[in-house]
Amino acid sequence: MRSVAVGAVDFSGRPFHFLGIGGIGMSALAYVLAKRHLPVSGSDLRRTHITDRLESVGAKIFQDQVPENLDYFQSLQVNPAVALPTGSPGSGLTLEQIAESASNGVNGNGRYQTHCLPQVVCSTAINEGNLEYQGAIAKNCPIYHRSDILAALIAESRGIGVAGTHGKTTTSSLIGYVLKEAGLDPTIVVGGEVDAWQGNAYLGSGEYLVAEVDESDGSLTKHHPEIGIVTNIELDHPDHYSTLAEVVEIFRTFESHCQTLIGCLDCGVVRQHLSPTITYSLENHPEADYQARQIKRQAHGNEVEVWERGVCLGTMTVTLPGDHNISNALAAVAVGRLLGLDFPVIAQAIASFNGAKRRFECKGYCNGITFIDDYAHHPSELLATLAAAKQKVTHGKYERVVAIFQPHRYSRTHTFMAEFATAFKDADLVVLTDIYSAGEQNPYNIRGEDLAKAVGQHHGHVVYQPRLTELREFLPKVLQSGDLALFLGAGNLNQQIAPVLAACA
């Protein structure tokens, strides 16, 4: 999808229309704009709790993608007989009133420009053959990529942008939560749902905006935050990048756009190619500005000493599992301290943070089996997540780690086949399904069975179950009391957790 808009994004009252509004990144932006009392509409082929939440704050949702959707706000002025639904643009005004406000230029936020065609927002997932997209071009609507809207929001705030191949969602959520608990009331836009604000976005009244900024399609270079964080850099998204050098160049450009860059020294690529203003590390790099020392790894979390430039600030409890989440918490400490927060305030917030959905999220228990949903879909993410799970077994909380993994994208599976083959060393049993295409073609002629064979060369207990629906019959036969069953992947495997749970009862 290409942006064809010329000029700045208009936040003064011109409507926004999102193509694929139910997506995790699109919906967060739509929510913030709707909460700002801007006219928001969008289309999505599926009705979900995410689209329901958007409707609850006034967005108009269409369940088809046709050019006529783009005329919605203009149509309000020619059909004044019907009242707006409660909470819709105009805050419950009749259509006559919103039409009048459009001509007079007045509403609760200043102006509604409903006489204008909307600003259309797309993500990379929308292809140029999409009928609604083609309609937007034909109607000469300004068309923006999702990242253009986020970049504009960051630019008008004191922006804090969290980048990195892994850990963006948890780190940005942690930072947002710390600032919120400290009373700074930031606006938060992240790529996962968080119970603390009951969704993937929160509109605050403060001057800060905390956002997860994405490198997957190269749009990271659009952002100019006051504070940037880079958690790590690795080759991923082989559908967009051919080499690690291409990824590094994107991050170097992002670094040049940040007033202050905070970077993790535990990543060799960050050490070699970036020059962060502020650094953090676990116990490996004593030169880091922020360090975690004396790590006590426990079944219910980790306790660490936090050091700031050679001075011990105190201890911190990280309830999220795994060393990677200690690292994510250190990034939040670094941001909080940069903003002048006292360490006890930061530590208390981190200790009470319960994480984001689909990040080691407990989905239920049955007959001594614990069911976990996790978004891990890259070999490094699998290694970190399974190491965290194994830590819980080591401390006696569970007896076995069972990894149920749905590979995500043919290109990723093909590119990282060797790395995937050794990524399951901390699992006692591995169950692999067929590959979730995410809309990709398969020029590699690769299947999940190929990955199962590769993993089987390094692991003695691998089962290939290609069809997701077959898991409902298979897993209850092999799962046993004391198992920690992890459903892993960025596709739709998580939709099988509830049926498997029910089948185990």
Swiss-Prot record:
It is found in: Cytoplasm. Its EC number is 6.3.2.8. InterPro entries: Mur-like_cat_sf, Mur_ligase_C, Mur_ligase_C_dom_sf, Mur_ligase_cen, Mur_ligase_N, MurCDEF_pg_biosynth, UDP-N-AcMur_Ala_ligase_MurC. It is an enzyme of class 6 (ligase). Keywords: ATP-binding, Cell cycle, Cell division, Cell shape, Cell wall biogenesis/degradation, Cytoplasm, Ligase, Nucleotide-binding, Peptidoglycan synthesis. It comes from the Bacteria. ATP binds at G164, T165, H166, G167, K168, T169, T170. Pathway: Cell wall biogenesis; peptidoglycan biosynthesis. Gene3D superfamilies: Mur ligase, C-terminal domain (3.90.190.20), Mur-like, catalytic domain (3.40.1190.10), NAD(P)-binding Rossmann-like Domain (3.40.50.720). GO terms for biological process: cell division; cell wall organization; peptidoglycan biosynthetic process; regulation of cell shape. It catalyses: UDP-N-acetyl-alpha-D-muramate + L-alanine + ATP = UDP-N-acetyl-alpha-D-muramoyl-L-alanine + ADP + phosphate + H(+). GO terms for cellular component: cytoplasm. Belongs to the MurCDEF family. Cell wall formation. NCBIfam families: murC. This is UDP-N-acetylmuramate--L-alanine ligase. It comes from Synechocystis sp. (strain ATCC 27184 / PCC 6803 / Kazusa). The lineage of its organism: Bacteria, Bacillati, Cyanobacteriota, Cyanophyceae, Synechococcales.
